[in-house]
Amino acid sequence: HAFVGSNIVEQPGELRKYDVSMGGTKWKPELPTAEKMNSLIEEYQNSLSTNATDTILTFMCKLMKMQAFNDGNKRTSMLVANHELIKKGKGILSIADEDRIEFGTRLIKYYENEESIEELKQFLYKKCLDGVNSNT
């Protein structure tokens, strides 16, 4: 986040220290902690051997939902996901302009209901992920 947010956001690379509201929902993320961030990273690293693509998308969605930083959470999460996807030869994630509203709607649904992550990931697989075999 420090790299992505440099000269763009306040306190790049630092965890958010205040409550925030999200547009389009009454849901509010908890304050992030170093322990929660480390736990998410550890969960990601421990799951990579099963299905790398699914693990990367899950990590991205959870990082977005965490809202760890003051700004740039979706940008940072997508850049990290694309870095990992490319590194593992699993394609690239890109949300087309015509899919942005549906993506936002599905993301908010996931924020409000943890179980909706599978619907969000299926949308990402079908409409936003190019050059990937979804079974690996």
Where are these regions (language model features)?
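FIC/Doc superfamily catalytic core
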Residues: 1-136
